[in-house]
Amino acid sequence: MITAIVNFKLPAEIDAKKATDLFKSSAPKYRAMKGLVRKYYLFDDHNRIGGGVYLWKSRADADAVYTPQWKAYIAERYGAPPDIRYFETPVVVDNESDKILADAA
C-alpha cells in the first residue's frame, strides 16, 4: 500500500467552514475510485494549509489520479498547486474494523 500526503497553501478567505464546504463537495468523486482505500481531508488554519491523506492499494493507482489535469484542478480550486509526498505503507492498524492490514512488500 501507498500513503500519499497532499498539501497546498490556502488563501486567507478560505476559513474552516469554506474548506469543509469545498471538501464535502469534492468527496463524492473519490467514492469507488479505483485503488483508493481511504481519504482524509486536512485543514490547518494557523499555517493556512489544506490537503488530504490518501491510502492507495498501489503507487500505480495513485499515479493514475495525480495527473497534470488533477494538479491543475487543485491549483484552480484552492489557489495553489499541490505538493505530493508518497510513503510505502506496509502495515495499517484499523481499530474500526479490528484488523491489522499488512502489505506483502
PLM segments and residue spans:
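A common structural junction motif
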Residues: 72-76
